[in-house]
Amino acid sequence: LGLVGFEVDWEVAEDPAFARIIARGSYLARAHLAHSVHAEVAGLAPGREYFYRFRLGPYESPVGRALTAPAATDSPAALRYAVCSCAHYEQGFFSAYRYMADDRPDLILELGDYIYESGYGERRVRLFDKREAVTLTDFRHRYAQYKLDPDLQAAHEACPWLVTWDDHEVSNDYAALVSSHEGCGGPAVRDAFVSLRAAAYQAWYENMPVRESRLRAGAGIQLYGDLDWGRLARFYVLDTRQYRSPLACALPATFATCDTEAGRALLRAGAGGGRQIGLNDPACKPELEDPSRTMLGAEQERWLDGALSSSRARWNLFAQGTPFAGILEGTPEAPTTFSDGWPGYPAARQRLLDALARHRVANPVILSGDPHAFFVNEVRNARGASVAVEMITTSIANNNKDKSKTLPRNPHIRFHDGTHSGYILCEATPGRMQADMVAIEDMRDPRTPRSVLASYEIVAGSSQPRRLEP
């Protein structure tokens, strides 16, 4: 399309045939933002189904389905939403997205790793056009390749999406402006990563359903926010990447260049990136437990505390990218945890638990992505009492990670499957929430069947998930 801007027309109707058009307008798609369209439509009725489409000259988009949230004073009978994360284009087909579209949820929650910046693996079913995305052009091409997938298109057409990000939209295990290659070349690497992150953030904005008003000066995006579904539910969309402190106890990466065998060995061992760290390691413990370390940043923490204090929702749902309850590994004498998740930020994790208790938040459910496995967890406080439920979705398509050998040491884990890709389908009513772990049989087969591995119920007022019999 070149460097010229284009006026893109949009229409909103009450029916998919567009016999009853209720709003129309145009949006200037600008070249410097890849001709992306972020139209915001005012005056729609709450709690309604609508349909929308776009036109540019003789070209017309497919019809998308949208739903508006119920009014703040309404008490809807039910909310149906799907939860997904981690879609690696090379590792598998996106059949899970197609099944998600077939389910016709009210919302899809995308918890990060919508794209992957890097290609890897032996059993790739298709190839990226470039192995590693580094520049703005690279990231734009990556999103374009993803957006051509018909199953992903079907999921976007099916319903609205509520989105956050994790690390692979930018770089594995990055923390704010610190990459997992920090130290591999000194200030030049830091400067290069700042540019890479800015390019990745811009491409993410261009390709995801977020408001233009979320753009911030200095190449940032205010991603976090909340959404009320009437009185039934409040969603808290968290940003666990842009403002976090560096990972604790990272292996030293002080070598002059990463392009050496010693440098590559350190990177493989986790230099600068997430790794298993000892909870009682005297060399690590002071940094790990430093109360100034943050996952969300001070401003986002203040916003979240205020949003929690004002909530009158029946269900309080946290959409965020990294595991919260955590998994103990290592040995009983020398326990370890993964440094990239919330357990690697124990003071920040405790502040969130304290806020839940202080504001008496009703029915908190933490929805997480990242580990390429299903989990249903009790979230326990320091006294061992269950205070929330965490549900972690597996990958849409990526190599799965089985943690079943760790279960005897982690009684808070009520369910785990690390052998399937898929998603979670939830339905919330005032009295209960049901979560179905929907698995696809083989992500490398585009016609693979699906099944429900397990269903769990959370009764309002309880933080004990209960498995339902088939």
Q: In which residue ranges do the predicted regions lie?
A:
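Metal-dependent phosphoester/phosphodiester hydrolase catalytic core
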Residues: 1-470
